[in-house]
């Protein structure tokens, strides 16, 4: 069996595409019912769960009403420093050439079945493995060329002495999960986390007899060609 690849690119965070609120050209509508939804929590509800108490605690210490915060989610959305309200990664085992969802007769391939098992185990263990990344949306798509996961998460960092005690911070969330502080652009918390997640996926693959081709960490910072094409279409539809 030829070695397969693990793809773990960053996504652009198009929840409407992920939740199939509209159908792009690369989607096979007849297979959309095959998709597996693990969690779909509204972003606003997730923010209340993650930061609601911290927001109320902060406001309780402010005697002046003009210093109180009304909506932490909107505060991040409206900040001028390009803060992200959430992050997305796409997780894929193989490519359409070696892990196609269906065969010529439209039946689920054996390679796809194995990939689904791996991706499902990854999805179901993500939160336990990443306690400071709150998973609020996770879906496996089987209505495109290759099985893949979309994972959406909110980074949670604790222990701030000024302002809200708990906040959205990807760097600090990684640090509080034990990843060392960055020493360069190529040696930082995000890269270390990506490496760990890819190692876990590699272990899951090898347990099922799949060899993995190592392509290097920089591949994780690139979008899959199929995904890039979909995102261009999504952006056009949302304009």
Predicted segments — roles?
Residues 1-239:
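N-terminal nicking endonuclease/strand-transfer module with a His-rich metal-binding environment
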